[in-house]
């Protein structure tokens, strides 16, 4: 839930107008909107490159994943792994635009650990892949934008553990 929605829900629950502090937080949120949209656009525009870089980094760091018997062994399973990385990148962009982790949580990470466990997918490798996405994104973004985006990647990694 965005800061705007949270503030309105809280004020309405107390049958009051928004407080000066709530209005200041909303003002800051709105002022940061251009940055959040710029970051999301850059990640979206470069998603194929970012996913490929992250996959390459993951497979170099975790060759067991793409070796015979690994969860990403073979062309089809490697494509599935890259599809999952693309999915997490998309979730990160949702969180960035919202300025909140709620979309990430509600759309994508609830129950994901259990799903990967049931599939025999090494969850730590998925987390490593998301960290690789964060690294790839940081080379594309300014330091300030990378710091803003980084917290959303970190949230996904934390949710996977």
Swiss-Prot record:
| Binding residue positions for (2R,3E)-phycocyanobilin | 81
| One Gene Ontology term, aspect cellular component | phycobilisome
The protein's location, in the record's own words, is: Cellular thylakoid membrane
Q: Which InterPro entries match?
A: Globin-like_sf, Phycobilisome_asu/bsu, Phycobilisome_asu/bsu_sf
For this protein, the record's SUPFAM superfamilies field holds:
Globin-like
* A Gene Ontology BP annotation from the UniProt entry: photosynthesis
Entries under PANTHER family matching the protein = ALLOPHYCOCYANIN ALPHA CHAIN, PHYCOBILISOME 32.1 KDA LINKER POLYPEPTIDE, PHYCOCYANIN-ASSOCIATED, ROD 2-RELATED
Q: How does it assemble?
A: Heterohexamer of two alpha chains, one alpha-B chain and three beta chains.
Which family, according to the similarity comment?
Belongs to the phycobiliprotein family.
* Purpose: Light-harvesting photosynthetic bile pigment-protein from the phycobiliprotein complex. Allophycocyanin has a maximum absorption at approximately 650 to 653 nanometers.
What is this protein called in UniProt?
Allophycocyanin subunit alpha 1
Quote the gene name from the UniProt entry: apcA1
